[in-house]
Amino acid sequence: MFYTHVLMSKRGPLAKIWLAAHWEKKLTKAHVFECNLEITIEKILSPKVKIALRTSGHLLLGVVRIYNRKAKYLLADCSEAFLKMKMTFCPGLVDLPKENFEASYNAITLPEEFHDFDTQNMNAIDVSEHFTQNQSRPEEITLRENFDNDLIFQAESFGEESEILRRHSFFDDNILLNSSGPLIEHSSGSLTGERSLFYDSGDGFGDEGAAGEMIDNLLQDDQNILLEDMHLNREISLPSEPPNSLAVEPDNSECICVPENEKMNETILLSTEEEGFTLDPIDISDIAEKRKGKKRRLLIDPIKELSSKVIHKQLTSFADTLMVLELAPPTQRLMMWKKRGGVHTLLSTAAQDLIHAELKMLFTKCFLSSGFKLGRKMIQKESVREEVGNQNIVETSMMQEPNYQQELSKPQTWKDVIGGSQHSSHEDTNKNINSEQDIVEMVSLAAEESSLMNDLFAQEIEYSPVELESLSNEENIETERWNGRILQMLNRLRESNKMGMQSFSLMKLCRNSDRKQAAAKFYSFLVLKKQLAIELSQSAPYADIIATMGPMFYNI
């Protein structure tokens, strides 16, 4: 089966259908609810790989079984919900008499009974007992200092020397004659008085009566060190009767005799605890309380990112680069520097001050400023005024005497608006008036321009209140503006026709005009052609456009 991977893949849409058709016992409740029958049937109808008719029948069987399972699960859920609702809302058990509609106060109110807490009585606490319960008694923490005789005579010898001394007598063998330490003579009376001190152990080795062996043990260096630790304030010496005997004289004249039935250096316990050593109560104030660590609070910035306005404000902020100009007390030189140091003065005057005043005036006249921004409406008005001003200059230059060049040196103004481009256009106009043909054309147009000036002033007076009233509606302003231009062009053509001109050249009308003015005149020609005021003709592509009178030339 080449399409086995389509049917048997675990994530495929037909896997659960194939499982339901062939192995229904393996189908779980989750498989049934996850299976979308609508998508599955679409996959069966339009499979990626062609499926045999028998296989598609098996898949439809799986669809039916899954649908049957879903119906059973839905029926079981509905039955369970119905039973729960029936058990919850029992109509026979809810009916109550009218007097029992409202519960009594005691039935819905908790009694205010305050029981005693299981805490100890603060007055019954014995503070002294509380602090002394962790203190031990002296006899529990103190080592006993009672040493037996076995410890005295067996310490640090491991039983070797005692065995030797037990077999050899001091009087028979000279074993310890070379031992270091002074030997002092002692009387026999002191010897008999001291024997009872060392023979009370009764260890059962049979040396209780051997006085010589006990004396030999006591004369060894190691045993003398132990005796010094036991605070014996006497020395032991040998009797003077034998020739090699040695005696030890006591340092003190008094002899302290210790009874045999009493142990040496035994710790004496006092009867009362007050006379003995007791620990003082512990002061709780001395114990520094463990400082509780504060839970560190996680601080998150409320502003996680910078907005575009904040970034733009930071980029355009010049507070760090500009400062307030602080000048010294004003003097004539400082004021002159302040006046001449401005941007307007530097960009509109010469860099040198040693220039004549007339030369400065000429420099100011020839200075061209660019990049001066005007509003949309003001730019169009300025273009119209420049056009009319140029034509007015041509008219005055042709009508007046030959000293017209001196008159051109003075700027011609219309409504006190002077632009740098006017002066350049004046020079271009003067250069173009060289040929006789141009002079004749300019003379013929002079009369037209004089009438157009009057019409333009009248139109601006008429349209100015309308424009002021309709500033809010920009579309109406644009329409009125173009209507004024078209009407101006039509009046100009009418004046030329009255002077005898039957055809009008667009190239001649656009002479000494910039691109924007030429486009406006061409658009005016097209609108007049649409209104049948003029007829347009062109001999060749990109050639001059010639306009002639149309049927509505004088009727618009």
From Swiss-Prot:
Where is this protein primarily located?
nucleus
Q: Where in the cell is it found?
A: Nucleus; Chromosome
State the superkingdom.
Answer: Eukaryota
Keyword vocabulary terms for this entry: Chromosome, Chromosome partition, Meiosis, Nucleus
Provide the coiled-coil residue spans. Answer: none
> Which cellular component terms (GO) are annotated to the entry?
chromosome; meiotic cohesin complex; nucleus
Q: Which GO terms describe its molecular function?
A: chromatin binding
- Name the SUPFAM superfamilies on file: Winged helix' DNA-binding domain (SSF46785)
Instruction: Output one GO BP term.
Output: sister chromatid cohesion
Nucleus as a keyword of this entry, yes or no, is yes
Give the protein's biological function: Meiosis-specific component of some cohesin complex required during the initial steps of prophase I in male meiosis. Probably required during early meiosis in males for separation of sister chromatids and homologous chromosomes. Replaces RAD21 in premeiotic S phase (during early stages of prophase I), while RAD21 reappears in later stages of prophase I. Involved in synaptonemal complex assembly, synapsis initiation and crossover recombination between homologous chromosomes during prophase I.
How does it associate, per the subunit comment? Component of some meiotic cohesin complex composed of the SMC1 (SMC1A or SMC1B) and SMC3 heterodimer attached via their hinge domain, RAD21L which link them, and STAG3.
What is the similarity comment for this entry? Belongs to the rad21 family.
Protein name per the record: Double-strand-break repair protein rad21-like protein 1
